[in-house]
């Protein structure tokens, strides 16, 4: 399998990197929200089961 090389202008590359960075930050934020939601659900389950 051969690979073709493509030249990407520096400003386009920087834009792509910036977009990737913003996606990584958004992903981290969503992971944190999910962990908080999991903790909240666990607390609700404890209350529902009368173990709190």
Curated annotation (Swiss-Prot):
One of its GO terms (biological process) is symbiont-mediated suppression of host innate immune response. Transmembrane segments: none annotated. The keyword 4Fe-4S does not apply. Keywords: Host-virus interaction, Inhibition of host innate immune response by virus, Viral immunoevasion. The keyword Heme does not apply. Plays a role in the inhibition of the host RecBCD complex (also called exonuclease V). A double mutation in this protein and the nucleotide kinase gp1.7 protein allows phage to overcome the retron Ec48 bacteriophage defense system. Overexpression of the wild-type gp5.9 protein in E.coli with an intact Ec48 retron leads to a dramatic decrease in cell counts consistent with cell death, the L23P mutant does not have this effect. This is Probable RecBCD inhibitor gp5.9. It comes from Escherichia phage T7.
